[in-house]
Curated annotation (Swiss-Prot):
Encoding gene (name): lpxH
Cofactor comment: Binds 2 Mn(2+) ions per subunit in a binuclear metal center.
Main location: membrane
Organism classification: Bacteria, Pseudomonadati, Pseudomonadota, Gammaproteobacteria, Vibrionales
A cellular component annotation (GO) from this entry: extrinsic component of plasma membrane
Record membrane topology: Peripheral membrane protein
EC annotation from Swiss-Prot or TrEMBL: 3.6.1.54
Obligatory cofactor(s): Mn(2+)
Catalysed transformations (reactions): UDP-2-N,3-O-bis[(3R)-3-hydroxytetradecanoyl]-alpha-D-glucosamine + H2O = 2-N,3-O-bis[(3R)-3-hydroxytetradecanoyl]-alpha-D-glucosaminyl 1-phosphate + UMP + 2 H(+)
Binding-site residues, substrate: N79, R80, D122, K164, K167, H195
Statement: the UniProt record of this protein carries the keyword Phosphoprotein: no
Protein name: UDP-2,3-diacylglucosamine hydrolase
Organism field: Aliivibrio fischeri (strain MJ11)
Length: 241
């Protein structure tokens, strides 16, 4: 049994190298897996399931082809694609999961998430996240004409770039106390997440138990894949062609 995890691809028409790497992964690696989990930020920005641009259709077709081959695909919303919803899933066969989801891997309970909720020291971001995740606000936003939403998102992108330059690295990383709190609350000893773009495996002791936190990498300069097979977790790099 092989299960794959990816996150933070930030797919965009402006980065055909990432797109090519993603398509190669879907057609030559994911096709041989039993399950594929996408833990958020698949897209650089997703402004609504009604955006059927040629690029979005291209990506959706890759998932549709994969699920039709019998590979189960799951998606957790990230901070860039939290508006990806039921229509996308219906069109592709992908199953949308809760922000915090516990899965069973050979009898072990494993918590999976995007990871942005763990960065509680970034107070401004958490306040922004709370606002944009309000159901009524998303309902209103999704009913704004598509071309206006595109302008709004472009403005938001520019502001995000400006703010990132002023934030310290520690603020943009997870808060260890929050990691431990969430893992204890969910009753797990293993956590898999993305968001921080810092692929690594961290082990620590909490309440006399050994805990493991696996961080997925981004796809900015190369692909990053976590493979689970025969109870072994392996982080792999995938070079751009």
């Amino acid at each position: 049994m092989t299960i794959l995890f990816i996150s933070d691809l930030h797919l965009s028409p402006l980065r055909p190298d990432i797109t090519d790497c993603f398509i190669d992964f879907m057609q030559n690696e994911a096709i041989h897996a039993e399950k594929l989990y996408v833990l958020g930020d698949l897209f650089e920005f997703w402004i609504g399931d009604d955006d059927n641009s040629p690029f979005n259709v291209l990506v959706k077709n890759e998932f549709k082809a994969l699920t039709k081959k019998g590979v189960k695909c799951y998606f957790i919303q990230g901070n860039r694609d939290f508006l990806l919803n039921k229509r996308f899933c219906k069109e592709t066969g992908v199953e949308l999961l809760d922000d915090h989801t516990v899965i069973d891997l050979d009898g072990e309970k494993v918590l999976i998430m995007h990871g942005d909720t763990l960065c509680i020291d970034d107070i401004k971001y958490q306040e922004f996240r709370a606002k944009v995740h309000k159901p009524w606000l998303q309902w209103v936003f999704n009913r704004i004409p598509l071309f206006i939403r595109q302008r709004i998102v472009k403005n938001v992108q520019d502001k995000i770039k400006e703010k990132k330059q002023t934030k310290t690295l520690c603020i943009m990383d997870v808060t260890q106390s929050e990691v431990e709190r969430v893992m204890q609350e969910e009753g797990v000893q293993r956590l898999i997440h993305g968001h921080t773009h810092r692929p690594d495996t961290h082990t620590f002791i909490s309440n006399d138990k050994e805990m493991t936190r696996i961080v997925l990498g981004d796809w900015y300069s190369q692909g990053s894949i976590l493979e689970y097979s025969d109870k072994i977790y392996s982080l792999h790099k995938k070079e751009f062609k």
